[in-house]
């Protein structure tokens, strides 16, 4: 398994009892890539401070998702913890993408991270706490010399 470093959201109740502050939720369906055993659907907390998605490990295993690596995540209190992650198909708001999901404790609140949101052109409006579609997904032009 590959080991990497990253950060967990600083404003969500996720791992190790961090306090929840965000209130935007969305229905998300996760499916393992390549021959999984079904779909896990849940009410996910949208957290723009989280890079990756997070779901209960037991639910991920039920649908055939297997860990493919581990990553060290820094929690809001500054402590670092290592967690396994797998790769999944992510469906929400009529969109589909694929990405990394952290195998969290079985009682954890699922999180939808910023990578999944940005990859389908959805952003969060902090004032209304709603998700909004961008008119277009930005691409940066690469300069050639």
Regions found by a protein language model. Name each.
Residues 2-145:
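Pepsin/retropepsin-fold aspartyl endopeptidases
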